[in-house]
Amino acid sequence: MSAPPALQIREANAHLAAVHRRAAELEARLDAAERTVHAQAERLALHDQQLRAALDELGRAKDREIATLQEQLMTSEATVHSLQATVHQRDELIRQLQPRAELLQDICRRRPPLAGLLDALAEAERLGPLPASDPGHPPPGGPGPPLDNSTGEEADRDHLQPAVFGTTV
């Protein structure tokens, strides 16, 4: 076999050198890409760990808030039950006091006429009893004979019981 010509050897050497440079360049790029991927993976892992920690903390905060809200709910429900019991007691008291209130309203409505009656009775007491007189001759302006619409029973009762003014209140 004969040796390849020098030009072919130089071309082959140049080609091999170019392939070697290209391989070295690709290996350098591959190393850089691997470092980049490794750095990104570490950052993603760290970020994932931070997110998991934040998520865990959010879960704990949520659980604490739920516990606090449940406690507030129980306190509020106890307050509502207490207030309902108070309302029931007051409703019962109102129910018991209602007849008395109606009676007091009735008394208040009747007070002015009653006050007038008491004033008239006081005036009658101030005037005092009539002087003794002859039953056959009544005093002028005094009681006269029974009226037509009077019954004999009323006349008998008037003669049996003399009128005495006074208050028993």
Curated annotation (Swiss-Prot):
Residues 7-89 form a coiled coil. GO terms for cellular component: cytoplasm; type III intermediate filament. It comes from the Eukaryota. Residues 126-169 are annotated as: Disordered. Residues 136-146 have a biased composition (Pro residues). It is found in: Cytoplasm. The keyword Cytoplasm applies. Its main location: cytoplasm. Residues 126-135 have a biased composition (Low complexity). Keywords: Coiled coil, Cytoplasm. This is Vimentin-type intermediate filament-associated coiled-coil protein.
